[in-house]
């Protein structure tokens, strides 16, 4: 360091400025140093060394070397304290290792004596070996010893594997909890050690700044007021001789610049810095003591864990190697003997029951075979009957369908024929109506002709009758009345003749009378011939009159019948037009029939296609029938399966009977077990009392350990808070000590703010006191273990930040590397 400083002095240039320019960055020397530096031994030395600016360089170098020596002495004191702590820890570790070695040797000796291990040389080497022997050899020896012990233990009696596995899992869980607690404690210890290292580093910086603060030479160089003469300097501060040598030139240069009232302010600042330094040292010492006590507690807990593991191993060894007398006198052995006797009795009864069941099973098999044959024969006959019935039903259905089609066709044909008949009847009605009218006309014409004939013959009565009669019925009535009148007149004449004959004589008188009468008739005839010519003329006149009368009546009748003739002609004309219309309609019908024929052809082809489809459906129906037949067969199989299941159910019933018998036997067994359990209960009550006493002791011990652990955690938290306060005090002290260095103060302020920010990030956001050591895998928010445990215990399992519900399995430890 001195050589580098001297090399730097050789490369420096001389100052050309005057003293009136104010304080410079370069160092100013006094007159004494200038005189001592003014006698060079080298002839080639230039005049730069004789310049006043380099006069105080030697004093500055000496003071810097002295400050480095003080810093080295402080570091040496710290190292000696740490070495003493390490030596104490080493002594404690050696003592614990010796105790553990003695315990291990005693344990191996006891195991060798109890288990009668053949290879005694392996355990002899353990006691004869040196504690400072090779670590590899010790590991090999321990491995040999453990393998020998395991072989001997494996050769012993049966071990309750389930119980050992359960104990192993419990021990593994307990070990994981201890490991977790150890990791948390180690992390806290590491944080405390890091904080202690940072505090020590800051303390060394503060001490260095304090020493520089008390140097008048540096204060004069930096342009600050000097320390008063009455200030007390501690043993770690620079010697006052250096200050006296540097007072001459520096005071002269800074007299004009320093204020007159700076001494009281400087002493107060110095006293404040000294107080802060002492408080920081006390905090560091307190932190170191707390760290040592915490490490001692960790070592104590580790020792307790090892002791508990050794006790557990001894207990397991005792459980696996019980003496024969203890086994014979134990209640479990007696219970096993009782159970063995009961089991033998049960075995004998089971054999007898099994023989009876085999006989019954043979009889049941024979009955089942006979019943199966009978059921199969009945099912086959019934299935055949059902098949015949299905075929007959299908034939009936086919026949009924064909008859239905024939009847539908016949009904359609009859409807068409009835329609034709109705049409013909209408036409015949029209013809009959016209025929009646023509008959009426003909009858009227016949009546006129009769009138003409009657007039020609001179029948006035006939002419008058025909003229007055309107119809043949009237004429017939008139003729009937005239005939009746004529008959009545003839009957009257015959009656008169009979009366006249009766009055005459029966012989001559009558003939004479007839002769006379004949003569009278001849006379009358002659008279009538004469009068005949006159009567003929009168008759011709009468006949002509009658003809005229008949012609007049005929003309009147013709006039009356003219309207009827015109109406009949109109009817005939209409009927003729109807016939023409019928002909056109028939032509249209013929065309329609042709169209219908084409449609019928299409229908025929579609019917043929439908027939093909029906044939396909028939084939499908046949296939369905086959499938149904198969289904019937499957049902027959199912029926057989049901028969088998019925046999199985019968077996189940017999099994249920067996189970009932077994349950009865079980009840008897349970009664015997109840008696054994009562005897066992008395023994368990005694064991429970012993276990409850030991459990109370263990619970009290665990509560004490829990309280100690809680107090230790609280003390750790308190120490962390004290450490944070000491850090803040040290930061304030450093800030007050380096107040004149603006850039350094700014950097320190930035570092403190960054440190506070990082510390706030590491602290729990819920309590703002402890650090984060738990994470919620549900939302990945981190908190301290106390806050999470309090929410788990109170069953308010929601995240304090986002209020998301979480389970106990979602809480995991947070590892910061």
From Swiss-Prot:
Gene3D superfamilies noted in UniProt: Zinc/RING finger domain, C3HC4 (zinc finger) (3.30.40.10)
Keywords: Chromatin regulator, Coiled coil, Metal-binding, Nucleus, Transferase, Ubl conjugation pathway, Zinc, Zinc-finger
Name of the protein described by the UniProt record: E3 ubiquitin-protein ligase BRE1
One Pfam family hit: zf-C3HC4
First-tier enzyme category under EC: transferase
E.C. number: 2.3.2.27
Residue ranges, annotated region (Disordered): 1-48, 497-534, 730-750
Polar residues bias (residue ranges): 502-512
Residue ranges with Basic and acidic residues bias: 21-33, 514-529
GO molecular function: ubiquitin protein ligase activity; zinc ion binding
Gene Ontology BP term (one): protein ubiquitination
Cysteine disulfide partners in this protein: none
Protein function: E3 ubiquitin-protein ligase that mediates monoubiquitination of histone H2B to form H2BK123ub1. H2BK123ub1 gives a specific tag for epigenetic transcriptional activation and is also a prerequisite for H3K4me and H3K79me formation.
InterPro entries, sorted: E3_ubiquit_lig_Bre1, Znf_C3HC4_RING-type, Znf_RING, Znf_RING/FYVE/PHD, Znf_RING_CS
Family per similarity comment: Belongs to the BRE1 family.
Coiled coil: 160-222, 265-505, 532-579, 658-739
Zinc finger annotations (RING-type) as residue ranges: 764-803
Pathway involvement of the protein, from the record: Protein modification; protein ubiquitination
Reactions this protein catalyses: S-ubiquitinyl-[E2 ubiquitin-conjugating enzyme]-L-cysteine + [acceptor protein]-L-lysine = [E2 ubiquitin-conjugating enzyme]-L-cysteine + N(6)-ubiquitinyl-[acceptor protein]-L-lysine
Organism: Mycosarcoma maydis (Corn smut fungus)
Compartments (UniProt record): Nucleus
Superkingdom assignment: Eukaryota
Cellular component GO terms, alphabetical: HULC complex; nucleus
